[in-house]
């Protein structure tokens, strides 16, 4: 079992119950899923780029990514409906906790010129979204085998009812928010 999950059950639940005066343990917000998305717009010209992006995402997440397709045709971007233009992975359970632990302890500190994550990236319902400019911050990616530096979107979906609850949950995990 992931250390972060044990830490959540032992420490974070007690901390949040006292902070928000919950009556039941089930009211305490928890991390539901983590979604990783990599948009590869250049895949229109070269399909190999999408395969490489999917391989990178598989290495980062530990599971096979789902290829996303264009919902509608856009002439300005030269894409048609149904063209493969990206890939995404939804992590739940044990893999989610392991990824979150790696993200907080290893990947985020390796971001260049890092001054903390924005605390304003909550959506109003306690879910947090962030973008990473380089996939090479993850130790699973071999720097020498990278054909192109790509970014990815990371969305942490929680059961929190408000942004304050979601922020308190992630802050309890020692998420490096900007002061």
UniProtKB/Swiss-Prot annotation:
Protein family membership: Belongs to the universal ribosomal protein uL5 family.
Oligomer status and interactors: Part of the 50S ribosomal subunit; part of the 5S rRNA/L5/L18/L25 subcomplex. Contacts the 5S rRNA and the P site tRNA. Forms a bridge to the 30S subunit in the 70S ribosome.
Originating gene: rplE
The protein's name: Large ribosomal subunit protein uL5
GO MF term (any one): structural constituent of ribosome
Keyword flag rRNA-binding: yes
Gene3D superfamilies to which the protein is assigned, alphabetical: 3.30.1440.10
Ranges annotated as spanning the membrane: none
């Amino acid at each position: 079992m992931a250390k972060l999950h044990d830490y959540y059950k032992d420490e974070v639940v007690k901390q949040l119950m006292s902070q928000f005066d919950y009556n039941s343990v089930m009211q305490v917000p928890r991390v539901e899923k983590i979604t990783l998305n990599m948009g590869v717009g250049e895949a229109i010209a070269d399909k190999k780029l999408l395969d490489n992006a999917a391989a990178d995402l598989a290495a980062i997440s530990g599971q096979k990514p789902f290829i996303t397709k264009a919902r509608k045709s856009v002439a300005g971007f030269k894409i048609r409906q149904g063209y493969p233009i990206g890939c995404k992975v939804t992590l739940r359970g044990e893999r989610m906790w392991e990824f979150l632990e790696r993200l907080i302890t290893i990947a985020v500190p390796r971001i260049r010129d890092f001054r903390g994550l924005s605390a304003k990236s909550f959506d109003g319902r306690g879910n947090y979204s962030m973008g990473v400019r380089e996939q090479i911050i993850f130790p699973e990616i071999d720097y020498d085998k990278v054909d192109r530096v790509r970014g990815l979107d990371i969305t942490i979906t929680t059961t929190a009812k408000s942004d304050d609850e979601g922020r308190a949950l992630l802050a309890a995990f020692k998420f490096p928010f900007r002061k």
